[in-house]
Amino acid sequence: MEIFPAIDLKEGRCVRLYQGEFSKETVMNEDPVAQAIIFEKFGAKTLHIVDLDGAIAGESLNLPIIEKICKAVRIPVQVGGGIRSLVAVEKLFSVGVDKVILGTAALYDKTFLEETVRLYKEKIIVGIDAKNGFVATRGWLDVSEISYIDLAKQMEKIGVQTIVFTDISKDGTLAGPNVEQLELLQKNVATRLIASGGVASIQDVKKLNDMNIYGVIIGKALYEKTIDLEEVLEVTKLC
């Protein structure tokens, strides 16, 4: 199982939100580059970065910081948030990003998604964020009438190989992942799944590993030290 430490960028800082609410933010580190270096030092193999400002604005607003992170670490970096054009995708790759995560565009611009997947194949990940089972977009501010299962099936047909699934109600809560929704997703698609939201303990990670989930994104639990990064990397290596 892959472990992805999370760095969420807002106004140039590393923050965590509670249940996706932008008004409920906690600054975890004023220097996201330093945080990336810390994660790498403790053994992270890949970093997961979300441009929260970009998710709302519809364009990357933290590109200079993302570029600095890519230059500061030797491990791959995957980035999501506000990426809604081929130019934006190409910019991220040009500054050293390894994989790009598309969210809102996956729901509203299938032509762009199909073209991007055709060009970059496994380098394109789709992020599906759900609220009560329905897909949320534009920085989680809008909730659609499309179920997360239906969107995942559409993504699989297009050729998307990896999906990041986030249950917004769990994000930043340390309440444990939404195992039921993940199990239902597994039954409906064969894509690789990365779980995000609510992971609070080594036991949560072991449960996801037992389900054969491809990867897990861990944010608040690392910052609040309910999960030790070195320990969880060792545990998943042995599983």
Curated annotation (Swiss-Prot):
Protein's gene: hisA
Gene3D superfamilies attached to this UniProt entry: Aldolase class I (3.20.20.70)
Keyword annotations: Amino-acid biosynthesis, Cytoplasm, Histidine biosynthesis, Isomerase
An example Gene Ontology CC term for this record: cytoplasm
NCBIfam families referenced in this protein's UniProt entry, alphabetically: 1-(5-phosphoribosyl)-5-[(5-phosphoribosylamino)methylideneamino]imidazole-4-carboxamide isomerase (TIGR00007)
Gene Ontology molecular-function annotations: 1-(5-phosphoribosyl)-5-[(5-phosphoribosylamino)methylideneamino]imidazole-4-carboxamide isomerase activity
Active-site residue list: 8 (proton acceptor), 129 (proton donor)
CDD domains: HisA
A Pfam family per the record: His_biosynth
E.C. no: 5.3.1.16
Name under which the protein is recorded: 1-(5-phosphoribosyl)-5-[(5-phosphoribosylamino)methylideneamino] imidazole-4-carboxamide isomerase
Catalytic activity reported: 1-(5-phospho-beta-D-ribosyl)-5-[(5-phospho-beta-D-ribosylamino)methylideneamino]imidazole-4-carboxamide = 5-[(5-phospho-1-deoxy-D-ribulos-1-ylimino)methylamino]-1-(5-phospho-beta-D-ribosyl)imidazole-4-carboxamide
GO biological process, one term: L-tryptophan biosynthetic process
Family per similarity comment: Belongs to the HisA/HisF family.
Pathway: Amino-acid biosynthesis; L-histidine biosynthesis; L-histidine from 5-phospho-alpha-D-ribose 1-diphosphate: step 4/9
Localisation: Cytoplasm
Organism: Bacillus cereus (strain ZK / E33L)
